[in-house]
Amino acid sequence: HARLTAAVAARHGLGCELVLSKLVPRTTENYTENGNVLLMRNFGAKLHILEPGSDSKAYARQLMRELRMARRKPYFIPFGGSSVMGALGYVECAREINSQLAAQDLRADQVFCTTGSGGTQAGLVAGFAAAGSTARVQGISVLFPQERIAPVVAGIANGVLMMLGHSPQ
């Protein structure tokens, strides 16, 4: 997600400051200086790489204050792009899945997806609900325990439903 954000910012001539947390316990130079890190730097992004356990949200809030004081106009994109706005693309994904199922005269009882920061699952939940589908979206968490990610998914999904003019679930 961060790499794509840096690429789009570069393409449109926008500055990009990325607040990243060290979630993977790898410290070799090959890991820390190549791949996505190298690409993000090549796109001109300024990287703020925080140690494990750091409060990245507080850091980002402070960085945004500093950028505003410097007369810049920062726009906050949360971890993984998981927000109501970020989940809207997966509403369209749910519509596409429903369309493909209907074209084959099929019905889904369950749809499975991986869940990291919650946005993909939330968008699918909202998309299927908005379409009146009874398919249950099962997220397989790759990052957080269920009790931590479930309320995040529900909050984003309900925000999407309200944005689309539907009642939250």
Where are each of the predicted segments found?
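Short, well-ordered alpha-helices that flank and scaffold nucleotide-derived cofactor binding pockets
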Residues: 7, 11, 99, 126-130
